[in-house]
From Swiss-Prot:
Organism: Caenorhabditis elegans
Family under the similarity heading: Belongs to the DEAD box helicase family. DDX6/DHH1 subfamily.
One of the protein's GO biological processes: spermatogenesis
Gene for this chain: cgh-1
Reactions performed catalytically: ATP + H2O = ADP + phosphate + H(+)
Keywords annotated in UniProt: Apoptosis, ATP-binding, Cytoplasm, Developmental protein, Differentiation, Helicase, Hydrolase, Nucleotide-binding, Oogenesis, RNA-binding, Spermatogenesis
Chief place of localization: cytoplasm
Signal sequence bounds: none
Taxonomic lineage of the native organism: Eukaryota, Metazoa, Ecdysozoa, Nematoda, Chromadorea
Protein name: ATP-dependent RNA helicase cgh-1
Chain span(s) of sequence motif Q motif: 43-71
């Protein structure tokens, strides 16, 4: 370890606790959290010997203690070992890799030192924002590059200093092949939502991309599901990866799942009833096609509710604006296609509605994971037609989960934040 690296690591147990007093901490989240994020061994962020500036960013982001995937992953990632990690959606996977990636970057070296690849533009923007917030006390330059934006802007930014790149595969490969994104110092590669990145959609791109990286590199894969393609990728590009599997149950413990049998023509009426009866903070409503997304959004507006819609055929700047405004809470309901099933973290979403039931278990798992984020509670409601009945049972069996008939009244304690508050006195005795 070099002298510069040694100076970066400041053990937090050095007796000087005064630095914490000056932190600008957000309000403490007193909502109930499930074992998906609380079932840990009691490790603290300080125990990883992270630099103080990074610790300040972690605490000021409101992250108090590592979740199970962070606890299992951060220490190993800091050693430089390859990682293959399976954990549920919404349990802190992004922090599990962002923290060690940022810690290992040397700001004095004005070159790309780490790259995070994600499958969608929205996830790239979200991940880059997290990295910026975590590293706000460090002189770190984070760049996000995705398709659908001006290539010339990316080229100009790469002419300056960039330490960490968050990218979708096609765009960053294009920049590498043009000789603009120079990767000789990029010794860390993270694939987030790795199952999607290793699917047919991106076939061949990752192999070409990895050829631009140094031979001595660290590769980390994070996902909720790992298809067979992961095995061949692992054998080809990874060296004795450390395997983490926190997937004994596939669905989030905090998401209660219901179904309602309806005829196709009754779906909008049923949705209207749900809007009236449920205490929705924010909801995401999934359809199986972009055309149905637009039609449903129009219907929802006609029956008197505000809603946004988003799908993959919209212009990128329009998608960005809708996504940003929904995150800010400017609208209660968002109708979308499966574009938004992966990694998107909007903590205010407490209800997910499958207006159209998904065709496979993997899509179902990712959709319902948009509620119940980071151990909080939420509900997923599935509108099931006669044709969907066999798919419903098959998905239940594949995910080893139970989807119950929806009761006349859904208990607010299952999904309403105000009903989930943990009393401060209870917390001290817990």
């Amino acid at each position: 370890m070099s002298g510069a690296e040694q100076q970066q690591i400041v053990p937090a147990n050095n007796g000087d606790e005064n630095w914490k007093a000056g932190l600008n901490l957000p309000a403490k989240d007193r909502r109930f959290k499930t074992a998906d994020v609380t079932d840990t061994k009691g490790v603290e962020f300080e125990d990883f010997c992270l630099g103080r500036d990074l610790l300040m960013g972690i605490f000021e982001k409101g992250w108090e203690k590592p979740s199970p995937i962070q606890e299992a992953s951060i220490g190993v990632a800091l050693t430089g070992q390859d990682i293959l990690a399976r954990a549920k959606n919404g349990t802190g996977k992004t922090g599990a890799y962002c923290i060690p990636v940022i810690e290992k970057i040397q700001p004095a070296l004005k070159a790309i030192q780490a790259m995070v690849i994600v499958p969608t533009r929205e996830l790239a923007l979200q991940t880059s924002q997290i990295c910026v917030e975590l590293s706000k006390h460090i002189q770190l330059k984070v760049m996000v590059t995705t398709g659908g934006t001006d290539l010339r802007d990316d080229i100009m930014r790469l002419n300056g200093t960039v330490h960490l790149v968050i990218a979708t595969p096609g765009r960053i490969l294009d920049l590498m092949e043009k000789g603009v994104a120079k990767m000789e110092h990029c010794k860390t590669l993270v694939l987030d939502e790795a199952d999607k990145l290793l699917s047919q959609d991106f076939q061949g791109i990752l192999d070409r991309l990895i050829n631009f990286l140094p031979k001595e590199r660290q590769v980390m894969l994070y996902s909720a599901t790992f298809p067979n393609t992961v095995t061949s990728f692992m054998q080809k590009h990874m060296h004795k990866p450390y395997e983490i599997n926190l997937m004994e149950e596939l669905t989030l413990l905090g998401v209660t799942q219901y179904y309602a049998f309806v005829q196709e023509k009754q779906k909008v009426h049923c949705l209207n009833t749900l809007f009236r009866k449920l205490q929705i903070n924010q909801s995401i409503i999934f359809c199986n096609s972009t055309q149905r997304v637009e039609l449903l959004a129009k219907k929802i507006t006609e029956i008197g509710y505000s809603c946004y819609y988003i799908h993959s055929k919209m212009a990128q700047n329009h998608r960005n604006r809708v996504f940003h405004d929904f995150r800010q809470g400017n609208c209660r309901n968002l109708v979308c296609s499966d574009l938004l099933t992966r990694g998107i973290d909007i903590q205010a979403v407490n209800v997910v509605i499958n207006f159209d039931f998904p065709r496979n278990a993997e899509t179902y798992l990712h959709r319902i994971g948009r509620s119940g984020r980071f151990g909080h509670l939420g509900v997923a409601i599935n509108l099931i037609t006669y044709e969907d009945r066999h798919t419903l049972r098959r998905i239940e069996q594949e995910l080893r989960t139970r989807i119950e008939p929806i009761p006349k009244t859904v208990d607010p304690k299952l999904y309403v934040a105000d009903q989930q508050l943990v009393d401060a006195a209870d917390e001290t005795t817990a």
